[in-house]
Amino acid sequence: MPSFDIVSEVKMNEVLNAVDNANRELATRFDFRGVEASFELNKEEVKLEADADFQLKQMVEILRAALLKRNIENSSMDVGDSVHSGKRFHLTVKFKQGIDKEVAKKLVKLIKDSKIKVQAAIQGDEVRVTGKKRDDLQETMALVRGAELGQPMQFQNFRD
């Protein structure tokens, strides 16, 4: 029986490349001349440091642009609040890895409400979709791509 998995993963090596590009852009921008500001990747999160809160907001936009250039959707970012310590401001950006239980339930409900002849089952942090026809699976993929679920979805293990 044909099947595929719906997952939500962010490639951390692409995030590393985006952070490097953002640091390079930060070094060349005129409005950051003479300002100590940096992006730093720690495992699953990016730490932003700057002298002022408005600079952090600009840095988040620089990071968003760098991530888009590396084909990472902005909906995978979870931007935290800025924290002031001493004369520096810090902000942490985390990335959503895997599908949460609530999002998985919404996804299964969306697929079942569409009346497409497929079955969806939650398996840990991914959703497995099985059906009798390949066309039904492709229709389900189009449905999931068009849905606004708050994080990007990828499809893996398409088996015929």
Swiss-Prot record:
SUPFAM superfamilies, per database record: YajQ-like
GO cellular component, as recorded: cytosol
Record's keyword terms, sorted: Nucleotide-binding
Keyword Aminoacyl-tRNA synthetase: no
Record keyword Nucleotide-binding present: yes
InterPro entries named among the record's database cross-references: DUF520 (IPR007551), UPF0234-like_C (IPR035571), UPF0234_N (IPR035570), YajQ-like_sf (IPR036183)
GO MF terms held by the record: nucleotide binding
Gene3D superfamilies, A to Z: 3.30.70.860, YajQ-like, domain 2
Record-stated family: Belongs to the YajQ family.
Function: Nucleotide-binding protein.
Name of the protein: Nucleotide-binding protein AHA_1129
The organism of origin for this protein: Aeromonas hydrophila subsp. hydrophila (strain ATCC 7966 / DSM 30187 / BCRC 13018 / CCUG 14551 / JCM 1027 / KCTC 2358 / NCIMB 9240 / NCTC 8049)
Upper lineage: Bacteria, Pseudomonadati, Pseudomonadota, Gammaproteobacteria, Aeromonadales
